[in-house]
Amino acid sequence: MRRIVLLLLVVGFGNYLLAQTPSETNGKAVFDKWCAPCHGAVAPKNVMFGNGALAGTSALAVKYKGKLPAVLEQRTDLTPVMIKSVVRHGLYGMPITRKTEVSDAELDDVVAYLTRNLKK
C-alpha cells in the first residue's frame, strides 16, 4: 500500500513539474498577442493608416542606433530578470503589464521564448 501511495505521489509531482516548465511555443503566442503589436519585426497592415512603424521597435532603433537589434526577438542580451522587470514595472514609455493580462506562468513562457538566443 505504501508503495502505491509513493508511486502516485511521484507521478503526480512529476506531472506538476512538467506543467510548470516554461514553453517557448506558448511564449511566442503570448509575445505575438501582447508584445508584437509594439515590439514586433513587421507592423501589421492597418486599414486606416497603412503600414507604419511599431512604437516599441522604432523607439529601440533610435535608442540603440544599430548597436543592438531593435526587434526584441532578435536580441541575444535579454536576461530573464530584465524582461520580467520591464514587463511588470514598465520602462520609459512602456506601460506595466498586470498579472491579470499576462500571468506569471505566461511571463515565464515569454522569457523562455525571448532568451532562447541568449549568449552563453
Task: Indicate where each model-derived feature is located.
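Sec-dependent N-terminal signal peptides
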Residues: I4-F13
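Inter-heme linker and motif-flanking segments adjacent to c-type heme-binding CXXCH motifs
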Residues: P44, N117-K120
